[in-house]
Structures are given as structure tokens and as C-alpha cells.
Amino acid sequence: MMSFSLLSIVSIALAATVSATSDGTNAYTAYPSVAKTASINGFADKIYDQLPECAKECVKQSTSNTPCPYWDTGCLCVMPQFGGAIGDCVAKNCKGKEVDSVESLATSICSSAGVGEPYWMIPSSVSDALAKAANAASATTSVETATKSAAAELATTSDTTIVASTSHESKVAETSVAQQTASTEKSSAAETSRAKETSKAEESSKAEETSVAQSSSSANVASVSAETANAGNMPVIAIGGVIAAFAALI
């Protein structure tokens, strides 16, 4: 009777095993296979090459403070002490999009290992520190952008001022040159007019001198003629006087 009971139990167990294998309800087949080795650890290996440089040293955390095998990705993802150490390091060394990249990769690797939400389990204080690191970089970027924009506007204004000043100086210089040219032309015209007046005066003076000389010459000629005429009359008068004297004596 007892042997029959043992045989029945073994048969039932074998039937259950065959049934479970044939219908595919083995719970372990629902999870991905896990490599039981890692060069760094089960968390870091698959994402290391995609991490920003600031986070690569952070994921090289020791797994000795966890009950997990160092190669077990899923186990490491749910250990706050392990994930928290990585998160603190990232918050101190990375900023902005670098932080976002690390969190995205961590979520992806933990989700792939079969871990449910929130996938990468870290303390809330570490989560806050990561958020501040990301936001601080965004604020810094905004300030830098505003500073660069202001500098660009200042440079543009300065260039405009320089151009305007140069244009003004150029116009002033052109005006000055034009004024000097006009003044020179006026001076030349005045000198030309003076030269003409001087020439006319000299010509008039020469004409007057010539006229005076001609008048003087005419007068001299007339005087000489008169003297010559008088000289011609003198013998006649003298002869007449002699004749009169003789007549008186007789």
C-alpha cells in the first residue's frame, strides 16, 4: 500500500514537470539571461561607453556594500546604497545634459534587466541633487547666452558708432577741403584781378609818360624853331641899326 502511494506521488511530480515544460509557464523564462561576469560591474558594463566622461569614474563603485553578485544588473539597480553613491558622484561632476544622459542610460539598463518603475532606485536626496545639477547648468547656459548677446549688441553698437563717427569725420574733412579749395580759388581770382588792375595801371602810366614825353619833345622843337627864326631876324635888325647910325652922322 505504501509503495503504491510513493509511486503515485512520483508519477504526479513527473507529470507536473512535463506539463510545465511543455506549456512554457516556467517563470524564469520571462527574465533575460544575466551574464555572470563583468569587467567593472553589472550596472556599468553595458552603458560605460555611452556615458559622458564626467560620469565614467562614478559607475566604478564597489558592490561590496550590497548583497548582490557584482555582475547582477537587476540586483544592483534596486540597491539605493549602490545607486546613491553613483548619483552623488554624478551630481558633483556633471552638469546639464550630462546629468540627463546618465539618468536616461541608468533607467534603460535597469528596465532591460526586468526592474519595474522607477527602474534605477536611488534615495530622494540624490535625485534632488541630480535635478539641481541639471538645472544649474541650464541657468548658467542662460546667463552665458544673455552675456554673449549683450556683448554682441555692444559690439554692434560700437561698430555703428565708429562708422558714424568715421562718416562724420569724413564729411567734415570733405567740407574743410571744399572750403579751402573755394578760398584758394577766391584768392587766385583776387590775385588775377589785382594783376590785371596793376597791368592796366602800368599801361596807363606808361601811356601818360609817353604823352608827356611827346608833349615835351614838341615843345622843345617849337622852342628851337622859334630861336632859329629869331636868329634869322637878328642880322636884319643889326644892319638896319648900322644904316641908321651912319645916316645920323651925316
From Swiss-Prot:
Disulfide bonds: 54-94, 58-89, 68-75, 77-110
Ranges of Low complexity composition bias in the record: 178-192, 210-219
UniProt feature, compositional bias: Basic and acidic residues: 193-209
GO biological process per UniProt: endocytic hemoglobin import into cell; intracellular iron ion homeostasis; single-species biofilm formation on inanimate substrate
Keywords of this entry: Cell membrane, Cell wall, Disulfide bond, Glycoprotein, GPI-anchor, Heme, Iron, Lipoprotein, Membrane, Metal-binding, Secreted, Signal
Signal peptide positions (record): 1-20
Membrane topology category: Lipid-anchor; GPI-anchor
Highest rank taxon of the organism: Eukaryota
Binding annotation for heme: 72
GO terms, molecular function: heme binding; metal ion binding
InterPro entries: Extracellular_membr_CFEM_dom (IPR008427)
Induction of its expression: Induced by RIM101 at pH8, hypoxia, ketoconazole, ciclopirox, and during hyphal growth. Regulated by UPC2 and BCR1.
Similarity remark: Belongs to the RBT5 family.
Function comment: Heme-binding protein involved in heme-iron utilization. The ability to acquire iron from host tissues is a major virulence factor of pathogenic microorganisms. Involved in biofilm formation.
Protein name from the UniProt record: GPI-anchored hemophore PGA10
